[in-house]
């Protein structure tokens, strides 16, 4: 009918009414489709700022459902990761190069966290805060080792990043990673006009302190004793006891372990532990000699030099009877 200009009465009144109704419904459908597409786009955009895993933990499926003050307590592994001396490293770069360089680095780190079952809670400048659920994973396997698995993956990714990017920029990045497992509070924090989904608690604070201690001990990854004991036997064989410390802002002392991927350290672990036993048994002179004998296995190791120096000093100046070998850290 429409193509035949000679045709008349192609659309009588009843057909015009039907056509008008169908047109209105089609217009509404198109409008709803565009609205749905926009909502989906907004949801995808928001998910880049607030992880979907965070929403699921709070029992919410949409960002619009979040309300101020919602919170839940949950056992998780908290990770803090930071580039060592980043400010000094990027002084030679212009601002745009700084941002591009940092985004490139983060693009290497984030996949390792996601692959291990974690999610990035926030980016803190050149730092990363990530969370790993400590609940049993599917198939009955433990999820407690996910943070450690991610940390080792990040070390491998860092080597690839340095080979592909840092060499061209004249930089070789090093990172520090702190891991701690325990109870945390996840919730919405802020005021009436500004909300932030975040995680708080002593577990978070200790993980942050451990990341800072990686500089003191000269190792890339540190974890607490409770975190170390929750690892699989294979991963525990990749840990080394380093110290008993009382970190700033924390009353109770914690055990500090290194997580490593070097075969030379793995082969020398028994000798390291024997030297530690001598040290904590107050046989300081013998401990000093035992630590010194490990120089070849732990070449340039900061913790080894520290324990050797401490053992020799205590051999000359024996401590009080209540000495228990706890180091107190005054700085964060």
Residue ranges and their predicted role:
Residues 1-5, 29, 80:
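Sensory-domain boundary capping and coupling elements
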Residues 184, 214-286, 292-293, 298-323:
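Cytosolic regulatory/linker segments at or just downstream of nucleotide-handling modules
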Residues 320-332:
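Intrinsically disordered, low-complexity, charge-biased linker/tail regions
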Residues 21-22, 26-73:
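Regulatory cytosolic signal-relay segments
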Residues 67-149, 197:
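Catalytic NTP-binding/metal-coordinating core of nucleotidyl cyclase/transferase enzymes
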């Amino acid at each position: 009918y429409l193509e035949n200009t000679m045709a008349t009465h192609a659309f009588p009144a009843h057909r015009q009414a039907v056509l008008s109704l169908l047109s209105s419904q089609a217009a509404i459908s198109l409008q709803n489709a565009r609205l749905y597409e926009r909502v989906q786009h907004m949801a995808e955009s928001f998910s880049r700022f607030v992880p979907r895993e965070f929403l699921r933990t709070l029992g919410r499926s949409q960002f619009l459902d979040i309300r101020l003050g919602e919170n839940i307590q949950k056992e998780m592994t908290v990770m803090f990761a930071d580039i060592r001396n980043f400010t000094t490293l990027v002084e030679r770069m212009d601002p745009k190069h700084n941002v591009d360089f940092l985004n490139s680095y983060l693009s290497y780190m984030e996949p390792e966290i996601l692959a291990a079952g974690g999610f990035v809670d926030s980016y803190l400048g050149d730092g990363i805060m990530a969370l790993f659920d400590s609940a049993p994973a599917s198939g009955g396997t433990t999820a407690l080792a996910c943070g450690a698995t991610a940390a080792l993956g990040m070390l491998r990714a860092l080597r690839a990043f340095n080979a592909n990017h840092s060499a061209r920029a004249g930089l070789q990045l090093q990172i520090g990673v702190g891991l701690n497992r325990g109870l945390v509070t996840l919730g919405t924090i802020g005021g009436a006009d500004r909300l932030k989904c975040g995680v708080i608690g002593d577990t978070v604070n200790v993980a942050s302190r451990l990341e800072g201690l990686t500089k003191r001990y000269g190792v890339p990854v540190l974890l607490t004793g409770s975190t170390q004991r929750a690892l699989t036997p294979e991963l525990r064989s990749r840990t080394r006891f380093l110290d008993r410390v009382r970190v700033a802002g924390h009353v109770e002392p914690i055990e500090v372990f290194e997580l490593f991927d070097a075969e030379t350290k793995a082969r020398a672990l028994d000798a390291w532990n024997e030297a530690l036993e001598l040290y904590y048994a107050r046989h300081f002179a013998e401990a000093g000699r035992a630590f010194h004998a490990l120089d070849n296995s732990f070449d340039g190791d900061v913790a080894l030099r520290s324990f050797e120096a401490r053992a020799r000093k205590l051999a000359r100046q024996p401590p009080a009877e209540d000495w228990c070998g706890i180091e107190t850290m005054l700085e964060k």
